[in-house]
């Protein structure tokens, strides 16, 4: 089942945290989930070229904190912070006047971010680059940047073929069943003249010991 379950959801509460962190009663839960979806969709569409990997949302009463992880913070922030201010006003309007605070975090090594790697491969496929070339170049960059393993998969009418198929390449280790393994997962779609091509990426960065286990090991060493 390790091949089927979402690598991030599988590790929630162990080495990963939720991207949306808030509590709501039954009456507000549906509204907040829809609001989170609209916030993420708006940011991704508005700042598609900013290399946004992940958007975290925290709520407290009428305040909403949005944390944007991006490879190009300059595009998000804009000249003298004009981009952030404009985005904040748009999100306040989207959420019905709630107080929005934005926190921009830079992704230091975008070659090790699975979502950005998948989007990069998809962008190349839209430019008619060979899918094999795009996948192998992305894998080589990730391994050079320190990844311990990477797997990329593309699915659809590859090269304009009449029959859709799936192809994948793998380098190094991808221990999907090991819960302490820090495996990043990303998915993107390439919109080509032949139809959509799905791109999936798994990147293994090493092991993360859960805090309790790490603390007990540290105590045992003494």
Swiss-Prot record:
One of its GO terms (biological process) is translation. GO terms for cellular component: cytosolic small ribosomal subunit. GO terms for molecular function: mRNA binding; rRNA binding; structural constituent of ribosome. The keyword Chaperone does not apply. Coiled coil: none annotated. Keywords: Ribonucleoprotein, Ribosomal protein, RNA-binding, rRNA-binding. Pfam families: KH_2, Ribosomal_S3_C. SUPFAM superfamilies: Prokaryotic type KH domain (KH-domain type II), Ribosomal protein S3 C-terminal domain. InterPro entries: KH_dom, KH_dom-like_a/b, KH_dom_type_2, KH_sf_prok-type, Ribosomal_S3_C_sf, Ribosomal_uS3_bac-typ, Ribosomal_uS3_C, Ribosomal_uS3_CS. Gene3D superfamilies: 3.30.300.20, Ribosomal protein S3, C-terminal domain (3.30.1140.32). Residues 39-108 form the KH type-2 domain. NCBIfam families: rpsC_bact (TIGR01009). HAMAP family: Ribosomal_uS3_B. Part of the 30S ribosomal subunit. Forms a tight complex with proteins S10 and S14. Belongs to the universal ribosomal protein uS3 family. Binds the lower part of the 30S subunit head. Binds mRNA in the 70S ribosome, positioning it for translation. This is Small ribosomal subunit protein uS3. It comes from Caldicellulosiruptor bescii (strain ATCC BAA-1888 / DSM 6725 / KCTC 15123 / Z-1320). The gene is rpsC.
């Amino acid at each position: 089942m390790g091949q089927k379950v979402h690598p991030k959801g599988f590790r929630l509460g162990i080495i990963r945290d939720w991207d949306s962190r808030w509590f709501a009663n039954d009456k507000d839960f549906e509204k907040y989930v829809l609001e989170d979806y609209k916030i993420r969709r708006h940011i991704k569409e508005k700042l598609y070229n900013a290399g946004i990997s992940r958007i975290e949302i925290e709520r407290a009463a009428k305040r909403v904190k949005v944390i944007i992880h991006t490879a190009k913070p300059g595009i998000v922030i804009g000249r003298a912070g004009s981009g952030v201010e404009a985005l904040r006003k748009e999100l306040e309007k989207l959420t019905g006047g709630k107080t929005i605070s934005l926190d921009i975090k830079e992704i230091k090594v975008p070659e090790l971010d699975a979502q950005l790697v998948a989007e990069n491969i998809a962008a190349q496929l839209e430019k008619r680059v060979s899918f094999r070339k795009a996948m192998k170049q992305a894998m080589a960059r990730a391994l050079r940047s320190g990844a311990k393993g990477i797997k990329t998969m593309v699915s659809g009418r590859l090269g304009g073929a009449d029959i859709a198929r799936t192809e994948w390449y793998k380098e190094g280790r991808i221990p999907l069943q090991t819960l302490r393994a820090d495996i990043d997962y990303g998915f993107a779609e390439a919109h080509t003249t032949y139809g959509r091509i799905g791109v999936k990426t798994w990147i293994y960065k090493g092991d993360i010991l859960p805090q309790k286990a790490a603390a007990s090991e540290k105590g045992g060493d003494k």
